[in-house]
Amino acid sequence: LTSKGELFHQETLRLLGELEGFEQYAAALKGELRGTLNLGVIDSTVSDKALPFAQAIGDYSQEHPAVHLHLSVMSPYELQLGVQDNRLDLAIGAFSTRMSGLVYQPLYREQHWLYCSTRHPLFAERRIPEPVITQQRMVGRGYWSQAELARHGFKHSAATVDSMEAQLILVLSGAYIGYLPEHYAEPWVEKGDLRVLLPATFGYQAPFSMIVRRGRSREPLIQTFRDLLKAQLNQP
């Protein structure tokens, strides 16, 4: 697209989003919700007990059966772009960088540890100096900047992935070490296939947020889902 064509495309998306928002608001005045709710989330959250995402979706669908749900799994960067250009109404993830025009509502923090597998030379070692670990071949994430990588104790990565499943595969290969969410790695830890490396040094917590485009928080479809998710999060 030319620069003018791109501007026209973006303006069309904005107007279509506003039109759908008006239709949803009119339906809400009649006491009903209808339309399409486009949700986005990062991968590997299904095993995270701290995020009652499936429960909130179940409640939402039961209370508002006329709403069509569309759920996408994307990287943090793609989620932010999707919300920014109205392809997504709401998204949940860990966002190390923020984009203008979006509202970020903190939810909780997800624990990550640095892992190696039984096939890795360090697996059987008990006292491993920190410099030895930082010299290992490490898996980075495609959405991590060099500064983000350095914050986790590494100067460079030997492999790059765009999903947690891909990261798990490379760590299980024994050729690399890498960070994984605790809840996601737990089944392999329990089977003895993975172990944590120096948790006091390399563990970190990823802050999760729910994001919407600025000015859209009060749209009925979005606000209703936000309220249901917050209610689930507040349950003991």
Regions found by a protein language model. Name each.
Residues 1-19, 26-29:
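Basic, amphipathic "hinge/linker" alpha-helix immediately C-terminal to the N-terminal HTH DNA-binding motif
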Residues 4-11, 52, 217-231:
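Short amphipathic alpha-helical coupling segments at ligand-binding clamshell hinges
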Residues 36-42, 91, 139, 178, ...:
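Short, well-ordered beta-strand segments
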Residues 72, 77-87, 164-175:
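Short helices/loops that flank or line small-molecule/ion binding pockets
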Residues 104-175, 180-205, 223, 231-236:
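C-terminal regulatory
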